[in-house]
Amino acid sequence: MKLPILVAVFDEVRAGRVDLAERVTYRRAMRVPGSGVLHDLDEGLAPTVRDLAMLMITISDNTAADLLFERVGRERVEQVMRDVGAPSVRIPFSILELFQELTDSPGAGYDALREKLRASAGSGGRAIVAEQSVRATPRDICRIFERLEARSILDPASCDAVLDILKRTKTDTRIPALLPKGTVVAHKTGTIRTVRCDAGIVYAPNGAYAIAILSKGVGNDLRVDMALAEISLAVYEEWTR
């Protein structure tokens, strides 16, 4: 869900409704458990929208994602996805709400959710019902990346900025893991319980290509990451053959 939020943020910037230099005051009540660092910081911090976008993508900061999701609005994120030709993308929950669904904890706050997530407690609720949860097809995810690389999803400068952020993603155990050293990849990973994914653009010697590898019903360990990395390598070898 963080890739669509990122694109929607820059679309709002293009439209003049959001400023990348705009500061968002962080409060402890805004914390979201899971990946990221904002939830460990003192309140009163005022990162810019660009700072939040960088944190959301590079270290998959959940709190940053929810702050941007609230700033742009869920309806706007989904409308942008329809406008760019990715109608399968649905984001009915913030990440906090998604975790509340997963753990059967409506209204629960940071501390309670963190403990339940650590224990993998809860039935999953609507979060595991495909028609009601966060979802997207690999085809539409690839379409987003293809249009970013073609500089057609936003204005060229915004596409450049989005791709620059995506190239800074820190998790490199999936699509980039087995590729030749120095291969540039602009990508975003996704992980929640038994779902592990990665999608992006690989800049191969003979041209760039979009790739989306999505898995579900899998274990939460690096063996799954290695399987995704092997798929990525197979695609790379076929592409560059």
List PLM regions with ranges.
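Short, charged low-complexity intrinsically disordered segments located at boundaries
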Residues: S35-D42, R82-S88, L98-F99, G107-E115, ...
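Flexible glycine/proline-enriched surface loops and loop-helix/loop-strand junctions
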Residues: T48-L52, I59-A64, A121-V129, S215-G217
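Mid-domain, small-residue-enriched loop/turn segments at the edges of structured enzyme/sensor domains
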Residues: D66-F145, E149-A150
